[in-house]
Design a protein with these regions (language model features):
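Membrane-interface helix-loop junctions and terminal tails of multi-pass membrane proteins
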Residues: 1-245
Length: 245
C-alpha cells in the first residue's frame, strides 16, 4: 500500500510541471466536465495515458517475465483458463482480489460485481474530490505545492487500504486497460477480455463516473462552503507616504 502512495507521489513530482500530472482519465475527464481542463486536450491526454500504461506494463513484463512460468507451474495455472487471473492480476484488476479473497463461488457471492463497481466509484470519487480540495485557492489548509504530491500519495494509500480486497483499486481506467490489453496479447485471453466475470469494463467506467460525481459534490456542496477571499483594502492616494525629491 505504501508503494502505491510513493509511486503516485513520485509520478506527480515528475510530471506536474509538464502536463499537470494528468495520468488518470478519471481526473482528466472530471476536470473537463467541471471546466477545469480544456476539452480539446482530453482525447490526446487519454491516449497518452493508455500508451504510457501499456509501456510501463511491458517494461515490467520484460524485467520480471522469468518469474511468471515457475509461479504458474507451481500453482498449476494454465494461462488463459479460469484461475490464471492469479497470475494475470499483475496486469489487470479483478473483482474480487483473487489473491486476497479468492476465485471460488463463495468469494464471488461475498463480492458481487455491483460491490466492485461501488468500490471503484467511491474510491475514485474520494480521490478526485481530494484533488479538487488540495488545489483550491480558497482552502486555507491546502498544502504548499511542494507537498501536494505527498498529500495525494497519502490519499491513495488510504483508498487502497480499503478497496484493494474488493476490486484491486484501479481508480484509473488507463492503469487497467493498457496493461489488460498487454495481458490479452501475452496469452491471458478471456481472462483479460472480457474477464472471468465479464467485468473488464468496471475498472474503466466506474472510476470515470466516480470522478465526475466528485466534481459535482465539490462544486455544488463543498465549494460554496468555503469562505470567500476578501478583497485587498484600497489605500487612498492621499494616505500614501509622500516621497521627497
Amino acid at each position: 500500500m505504501l508503494m502505491w502512495g510513493c509511486a503516485v507521489a513520485i509520478a506527480v513530482y515528475v510530471g506536474a510541471a509538464i502536463s499537470g500530472a494528468h495520468y488518470n482519465p478519471s481526473v482528466t475527464i472530471a476536470m473537463a466536465v467541471w471546466n477545469r481542463f480544456p476539452w480539446k486536450r482530453v482525447v490526446p491526454y487519454i491516449l497518452s495515458q493508455l500508451v504510457g500504461a501499456f509501456g510501463a506494463a511491458l517494461t515490467l513484463w520484460i524485467m520480471f517475465r522469468g518469474f511468471a512460468a515457475p509461479f504458474e507451474a507451481a500453482n498449476k495455472i494454465v494461462r488463459g483458463e479460469f484461475g490464471s487471473q492469479l497470475s494475470g492480476m499483475v496486469f489487470a484488476t479483478y473483482i474480487p482480489n483473487p489473491a486476497a479473497v479468492g476465485m471460488t463461488p463463495l468469494a464471488y457471492a461475498q463480492v458481487p460485481l455491483y460491490v466492485g463497481f461501488m468500490s471503484e466509484f467511491i474510491g475514485t470519487m474520494f480521490l478526485v474530490l481530494m484533488i479538487f480540495v488540495l488545489i483550491e485557492e480558497r482552502n486555507d489548509l491546502k498544502p504548499h505545492i511542494t507537498f501536494f504530491p505527498v498529500a495525494l500519495g497519502v490519499v491513495v494509500i488510504a483508498i487502497v487500504s480499503i478497496t484493494a480486497p474488493l476490486s484491486m483499486t484501479s481508480l484509473n481506467g488507463a492503469r487497467d486497460l493498457g496493461p489488460r490489453f498487454l495481458a490479452y496479447l501475452l496469452g491471458w485471453g478471456q481472462m483479460a477480455f472480457p474477464g472471468p466475470r465479464g467485468e473488464f469494463w468496471i475498472p474503466t467506467v466506474a472510476p470515470i463516473l466516480g470522478g465526475i460525481f466528485a466534481g459535482f459534490v465539490y462544486n455544488k456542496i463543498v465549494l460554496p462552503l468555503y469562505p470567500k477571499k476578501s478583497a485587498e483594502p484600497i489605500v487612498a492616494a492621499e494616505s500614501k507616504p509622500s516621497v521627497s525629491a
